[in-house]
């Protein structure tokens, strides 16, 4: 800290001034953006019954439509990360938000399978930078000891968005049809993109950030001075990043967590209806419970992580331990194979999904270890590996269920993937510290 900043901060503290709370407003922007992100990608599930009937799309083709998003979403992670490092948080998120909202809106204009697939492909590409931007913004705006809680707050939008807005979305579809559903969500996203452009600033540019809050961020390891230089992309950078055990271990762990998440986003209602023989009304009621539990897991994981980091000063304990515990909890999904009570099954599923929610801390860990100037590329690599689960999990579970006629081995696969994540964090990841790359 230079002498001017030190004297300025000391004088402010002596006069009784308090740090501003501008970073909370920035976090609110991320939380709303993440909620819109997940609404845009999952609203197809609500529209599917009306949409398939009107467009004449059968179940097999609809499965391809559901998976189309994950293909381009994963493939666009690295290019999206490069773009983010080149153009920064504000421009990247504004363009991504605007484009994914327009592609969501265009779903409402689809006339057949081909146009619907084009919309899904476009949605996947345009949503790709969202979580790398989130991670990069948290790294800039929050000291290390607050990042897990901040990550948890925006991540909870993944689970609560659809649950909170489902009644409104069903009402829109029931009153105006499935096309109005996509148009409404898309229009809301475009409007929020304008809010983002108007409100977001980097810490060193934000006039609402006072000196005390600025020093709080900088002293805690936030990249808020504006002095960080963009690192030009080159293929050797990717090789160097992939060679780092921290990146490999964290990516495998996140892939494991996403395997559990994708099961709940895709096959879980079918599991309840066909394996547990629940009527659809009961499925609708019970399916909400694990998602509420997962939201609790996200918040609990963030709280525990920051508490551990503050109490011990160890990023290894503060970041790794909650994720390992969460993956172990997620692996208990296997035990549902031997339960006969529907309530017991839902409780086990909720416990497992609570644990999966804690794995969202992986983004906090990435913000801690990403090389300076390469937060976007690092986040893109990490998210690419994690979202391979979005491609593989629905296909593998579908093959298992088709071959065996039940979900017994499917649940073993999901639990086994969670245990693979535990092994990656214990034996591969190593120390949680910022990576230094050779020039």
Could you tell me what each predicted segment is?
Residues 316-362:
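C-terminal transmembrane helical hairpin of 12-TM major facilitator-type secondary transporters
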Residues 25-59, 264-269:
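Extracytoplasmic
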Residues 44-45, 242-299, 359, 363, ...:
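Extracytoplasmic gate region of multi-pass secondary transporters
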Residues 56, 88, 109-115, 126, ...:
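Helix-breaking motifs and short loop linkers at transmembrane-helix boundaries and internal kinks
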Residues 367-404:
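A late C-terminal transmembrane helix in Major Facilitator Superfamily
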Residues 119-159:
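Cytoplasmic helix-loop-helix junction between adjacent transmembrane helices
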Residues 75-113:
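Conserved MFS/SLC helix-loop-helix module at the cytosolic interface between two early adjacent transmembrane helices
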Residues 154-207:
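Helix-loop-helix hairpin linking two adjacent transmembrane segments in secondary transporters
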């Amino acid at each position: 800290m230079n002498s001017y900043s030190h004297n300025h901060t000391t004088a402010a503290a002596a006069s009784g001034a308090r740090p501003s709370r501008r970073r909370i407003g920035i976090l609110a922007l991320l939380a709303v953006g993440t909620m819109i992100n997940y609404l845009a990608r999952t609203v197809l599930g609500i529209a599917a019954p009306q949409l398939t009937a009107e467009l004449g799309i059968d179940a097999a083709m609809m499965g391809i439509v559901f998976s189309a998003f994950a293909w381009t979403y994963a493939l666009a992670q690295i290019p999206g990360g490069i773009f983010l490092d080149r153009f920064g948080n504000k421009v990247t998120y504004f363009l991504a938000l605007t484009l994914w909202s327009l592609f969501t809106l265009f779903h409402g204009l689809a006339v057949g399978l081909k146009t619907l697939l084009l919309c899904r492909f476009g949605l996947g590409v345009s949503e790709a930078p969202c979580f790398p931007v989130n991670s990069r913004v948290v790294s800039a705006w929050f000291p290390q000891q607050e990042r897990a809680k901040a990550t948890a707050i925006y991540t909870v939008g993944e689970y609560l968005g659809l649950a909170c807005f489902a009644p409104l979305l069903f009402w829109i579809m029931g009153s105006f049809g499935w096309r109005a559903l996509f148009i409404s969500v898309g229009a809301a996203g475009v409007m929020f993109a304008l809010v983002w452009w108007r409100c977001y600033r980097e810490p060193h540019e934000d006039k609402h950030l006072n000196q005390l809050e600025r020093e709080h961020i900088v002293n805690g390891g936030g990249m808020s001075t504006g002095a960080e230089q963009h690192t030009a992309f080159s293929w050797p950078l990717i090789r160097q990043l992939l060679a780092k055990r921290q990146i490999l271990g964290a990516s495998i762990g996140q892939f494991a967590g996403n395997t559990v998440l994708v099961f709940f986003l895709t096959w879980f209602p079918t599991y309840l209806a066909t394996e547990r023989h629940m009527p659809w009304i009961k499925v609708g009621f019970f399916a909400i419970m694990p998602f509420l539990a997962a939201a609790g897991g996200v918040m609990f994981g963030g709280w525990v992580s920051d508490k551990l980091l503050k109490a011990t000063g160890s990023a290894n304990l503060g970041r790794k331990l909650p994720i390992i515990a969460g993956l172990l909890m997620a692996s208990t999904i296997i035990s549902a194979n031997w339960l006969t009570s529907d309530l017991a099954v839902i409780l086990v599923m909720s416990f497992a999904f609570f644990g999966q929610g804690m794995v969202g801390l992986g983004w906090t860990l990435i913000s801690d270890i990403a090389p300076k100037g390469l937060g976007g590329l690092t986040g893109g690599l990490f998210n690419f590996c994690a979202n391979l689960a979005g491609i593989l999990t629905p296909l593998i579970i579908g093959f298992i269920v088709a071959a065996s006629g039940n979900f017994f081995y499917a649940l073993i696969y999901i639990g086994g993937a969670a245990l693979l994540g535990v092994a990656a964090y214990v034996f591969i990841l190593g120390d949680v510290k910022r990576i230094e790359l050779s020039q």
